[in-house]
C-alpha cells in the first residue's frame, strides 16, 4: 500500500512515469497500470458524485495537445498508432468554485462540442449562464443541450498586430491580447 501511495503521489506532483519507476524501484509497467487504475477510479467517482450541481456561471473551453505526433507529422512518423495526432480536451468549469463539472477528450469538431454540452446538461440543476470562446460549434451544442434553460454568451479575445510575429524570438510566443468582445447569444 505504501508503494502505491508513493507512486500516485509522485505522479500527481508531475513526475514522469520513468522517474517514478526509478524512485519507487518498480517497473514502468507497474506505474502505467497504477495510472490507468487510478484514472478509471477517478472517472467513476466523478461520474457518480458530480450530479445535480447548482451552478450559476459555467465556462467552457477546449485545449489542444497531441498524442504521439502532431497531426501534420503523423504520416511521416514511424509506427504511429491509429489514435496519433491532435487531441482536444474539452472542459466545463464552474466559474465560481472551479469545479470541473464536465470534460471530454476528442477532436475539435461540432460533435465533440455536442458531447461535452449534453453531458454538462445532465450534470447541472437549474438555469445556468454559459460562456465560451468564439468557436462556432458551441452555438448548436448549447442550444441542443439546454434549449431555453441557459443564458449563453461568447467571449472573443482580440489580439493586436505584432511586427515581430515572424521573428525567431516570437515563433512560439502567443500574440498579445489587447482586449475582448462579448457576444450575447
Across the structure, where does each feature detected by a protein language model lie?
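Residue-level recognition of single "structural anchor" positions
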Residues: 1-185
Amino acid at each position: 500500500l505504501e508503494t502505491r501511495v508513493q507512486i500516485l503521489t509522485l505522479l500527481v506532483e508531475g513526475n514522469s512515469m520513468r522517474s517514478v519507476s526509478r524512485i519507487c524501484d518498480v517497473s514502468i509497467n507497474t506505474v502505467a497500470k497504477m495510472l490507468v487504475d487510478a484514472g478509471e477510479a477517478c472517472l467513476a467517482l466523478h461520474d457518480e458524485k458530480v450530479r445535480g450541481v447548482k451552478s450559476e456561471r459555467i465556462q467552457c473551453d477546449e485545449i489542444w495537445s497531441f498524442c504521439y505526433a502532431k497531426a501534420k507529422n503523423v504520416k511521416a512518423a514511424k509506427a504511429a498508432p491509429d489514435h496519433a495526432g491532435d487531441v482536444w480536451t474539452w472542459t466545463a468549469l464552474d466559474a465560481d468554485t472551479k469545479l470541473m463539472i464536465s470534460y471530454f477528450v476528442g477532436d475539435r469538431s461540432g460533435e465533440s462540442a455536442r458531447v461535452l454540452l449534453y453531458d454538462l446538461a445532465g450534470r447541472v440543476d437549474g438555469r445556468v449562464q454559459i460562456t465560451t470562446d468564439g468557436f462556432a460549434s458551441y452555438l448548436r451544442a448549447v442550444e441542443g443541450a439546454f434549449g431555453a434553460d441557459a443564458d449563453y454568451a461568447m467571449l472573443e479575445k482580440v489580439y493586436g498586430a505584432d511586427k515581430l510575429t515572424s521573428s525567431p524570438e516570437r515563433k512560439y510566443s502567443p500574440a498579445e491580447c489587447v482586449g475582448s468582445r462579448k457576444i450575447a447569444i
